[in-house]
């Protein structure tokens, strides 16, 4: 009878376990003893209370009167990537008072660069900008999106942040091991609201793959452009997350100098 040796598989199992322990050790080293900051200053802020004096509000009222609409709120589906992108860009360029952006992921790529440049331009002309971003994907190159927080008139908060080194994917992964219950509570909301009058909600995050610009593959998503009082309800959900204790101002997590060092490395 043919006998099969069990020594080789056993040796491989030992090597696999040893490699895993090494990886865990490296991960813990990269994570270090860092924790979330305490006694963080989170000034409470709310959506624009009275949007009636803005150009967008006037436009909505004119469109409503022309259409003889019976319902105070209106909706338009944005099924195409180009319509989804140009609509967001138009909201930024038309905003006079406030912009509120809430996303699960914002990628630092060509599509987002142009959009965020417009957001910065809006802040420079006096628009109050609030950006709320889930922290799971804000590592490596995408961490540079957090530089928005250091632009005047822009406030940026990270929801439910991880504690691992932001320039290490492995460190970030291992930071979740000891606090998995909290770490799996991610913020998948996606809102883009201008002057508390017009808002976009749907499946798209911000990045090339959501706007048909990724050569490797693109997501097929659907958005809704909403107008009228329903937008104020969207803003209420934004405010609830924005003022939540799990929303940390970027400045409490990382400095501008650290972001620049990451970019240079």
Predicted regions and their residues:
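N-terminal localization/anchoring segments of enzymes in phospholipid and broader phosphate metabolism
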Residues: 2-265
